[in-house]
Swiss-Prot record:
EC number(s) given by UniProt: 2.7.8.7
Annotated protein name in UniProt: Holo-[acyl-carrier-protein] synthase
Described function: Transfers the 4'-phosphopantetheine moiety from coenzyme A to a Ser of acyl-carrier-protein.
Superkingdom in the source lineage: Bacteria
InterPro entries cross-referenced by the UniProt entry: 4-PPantetheinyl_Trfase_dom, 4-PPantetheinyl_Trfase_dom_sf, ACPS, P-Pant_transferase_sf, Ppantetheine-prot_Trfase_dom
Subcellular location(s) per record: Cytoplasm
MF annotations from Gene Ontology: holo-[acyl-carrier-protein] synthase activity; magnesium ion binding
GO cellular component annotations of the record: cytosol
One protein family per Pfam: ACPS
Keywords per UniProt: Cytoplasm, Fatty acid biosynthesis, Fatty acid metabolism, Lipid biosynthesis, Lipid metabolism, Magnesium, Metal-binding, Transferase
Positions bound to Mg(2+): 8, 58
Top-rank EC class of the record's enzyme: transferase
SUPFAM superfamilies: 4'-phosphopantetheinyl transferase
Gene source species: Halalkalibacterium halodurans (strain ATCC BAA-125 / DSM 18197 / FERM 7344 / JCM 9153 / C-125)
Amino acid sequence: MIIGTGIDIVELERIQSMVEKHPRFVKKILTENEQEVFARLSRRRRLEYIAGRFAAKEAFVKAVGTGISAEYGWHDLEVLSDERGKPVLSVNLDATIHVSISHSQSYAIAQVILERLSS
């Protein structure tokens, strides 16, 4: 049974501006593991990566209905890729989390679907 859905879209230009104007932005948004991946990427891929993770985390908090808050902060949510490159969102929640991230030249978008198996 689907218990929540969320979607978020961000302009890459806006995220690039935040990264340039606020040196701590990357550390604020990304977990240590995400930062390690980020550091290994090309400049262009870094922008897509942080924008995609930003959008995925925003989509998740929309799906649970809380927004970024004390319950779910930026570092409570971690989005890494599995062995096939599929994004996996890790968080303490009793539900299956489906996440999809996509990029274009100007935007990053993410969708999260929360599913609970019937008991």
